[in-house]
Structures are given as C-alpha cells and as structure tokens.
Amino acid sequence: MEVNILAVIATALFVLIPTAFLLILYVKTESAGS
C-alpha cells in the first residue's frame, strides 16, 4: 500500500493548526484570568 506523503502532511496540518490555535487561545485566557 503506497502512502501519499502530501495527503499525510495535509491531514497533519489540518489537525495540528486548529489544535495549536485553540491551545494558544486557552493559554491566553488562563493568563488573563489570573
């Protein structure tokens, strides 16, 4: 089974970018709260 590298990269970015964005927002909110 051939693995499509571009598909893997696209999937990784599609998952990691929103996760990192939400994590940054969460940290900023926690810092502002305290």
From Swiss-Prot:
GO terms for biological process: photosynthesis, light reaction. Keywords: Chloroplast, Membrane, Photosynthesis, Photosystem II, Plastid, Reaction center, Thylakoid, Transmembrane, Transmembrane helix. Pfam families: PsbM (PF05151). It is a single-pass membrane protein. InterPro entries: PSII_PsbM, PSII_PsbM_sf. One of its GO terms (cellular component) is chloroplast thylakoid membrane. Its main location: plastid. The chain crosses the membrane at residues 5-25. It is found in: Plastid, Chloroplast thylakoid membrane. The keyword Signal does not apply. PANTHER family: PHOTOSYSTEM II REACTION CENTER PROTEIN M (PTHR35774:SF1). Belongs to the PsbM family. PSII is composed of 1 copy each of membrane proteins PsbA, PsbB, PsbC, PsbD, PsbE, PsbF, PsbH, PsbI, PsbJ, PsbK, PsbL, PsbM, PsbT, PsbX, PsbY, PsbZ, Psb30/Ycf12, at least 3 peripheral proteins of the oxygen-evolving complex and a large number of cofactors. It forms dimeric complexes. One of the components of the core complex of photosystem II (PSII). PSII is a light-driven water:plastoquinone oxidoreductase that uses light energy to abstract electrons from H(2)O, generating O(2) and a proton gradient subsequently used for ATP formation. It consists of a core antenna complex that captures photons, and an electron transfer chain that converts photonic excitation into a charge separation. This subunit is found at the monomer-monomer interface. This is Photosystem II reaction center protein M. The gene is psbM.
